[in-house]
């Protein structure tokens, strides 16, 4: 009986390539978060959440990157350039979306605790709100 080759199996489809990217991205994030946890910089919960977000983001970016490289085709340089550019854009968009979602959740939590929202505070740099002598 032949041994099962996971990498070969996953590389046969674009979603499989995305899973492989998620495994690699999640592994890198876990290694980073374990060091941060040992230094006392983050909690276990924060490490788990960040590792999950990074794994999903890397998997998504890898999937979109593999698809784009396949659509564009071309030679090695064009395919690699396309894959790299699309992966960077995909991961950037994922991270931006996560930051926005976390900010909304923090604002909602702040409101539930009876605090003001950031939108309630006047903008100190708004020229219309400055007093004129």
From Swiss-Prot:
Lumenal topological domain: 27-67
Superkingdom of origin organism: Bacteria
Comment text on domains: The lumenal magnetite interacting component (MIC, residues 37-57) probably binds magnetite.
Sequence segments annotated as region (Disordered): 105-133
Membrane topology per record: Multi-pass membrane protein
TM annotation in the entry: 6-26, 68-88
Compartments in which it is found: Magnetosome membrane
Additional remark text: This bacteria makes magnetosomes having a pseudo-hexagonal prismatic crystal of magnetite (Fe(3)O(4)).
GO CC annotations, alphabetized: magnetosome membrane
Chief place of localization: membrane
Role of this protein: Probably helps control the size of magnetite crystals; in vitro synthesis of magnetite yields larger and more well-developed magnetite crystals in the presence of purified MamC. Binds Fe(3+). The lumenal domain probably binds magnetite crystals, affecting crystal size and shape. Purified MamC self-assembles into micelles in the presence of ferric chloride hexahydrate (FeCl(3).6H(2)O); both oxygen and iron are present in the proteinaceous micelles. Whether this is relevant in vivo is unknown.
Keywords: Biomineralization, Iron, Magnetosome, Membrane, Metal-binding, Transmembrane, Transmembrane helix
Subunit relationships: Probably interacts with MamA.
Protein name per its UniProtKB record: Magnetosome protein MamC
Family: Belongs to the magnetosome MamC family.
Disulfide bond entries: none
Residue ranges, annotated region (Magnetite interacting component (MIC) binds magnetite): 37-57
């Amino acid at each position: 009986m032949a041994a099962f080759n996971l990498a070969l199996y996953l590389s046969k489809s674009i979603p499989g390539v995305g899973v492989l990217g998620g495994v690699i991205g999640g592994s890198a994030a876990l290694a980073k978060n374990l060091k941060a946890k040992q230094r006392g910089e983050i909690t276990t919960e924060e490490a788990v959440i960040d590792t999950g977000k990074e794994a999903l983001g890397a998997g998504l970016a890898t999937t979109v990157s593999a698809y784009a490289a396949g659509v564009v085709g071309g030679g090695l340089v064009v395919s690699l350039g396309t894959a790299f550019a699309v992966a960077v854009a995909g991961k950037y968009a994922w991270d931006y979306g996560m930051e926005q979602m976390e900010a909304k959740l923090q604002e909602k939590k702040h409101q539930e605790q009876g605090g003001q929202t950031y939108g309630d505070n006047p903008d100190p740099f708004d020229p219309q709100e400055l007093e004129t002598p």
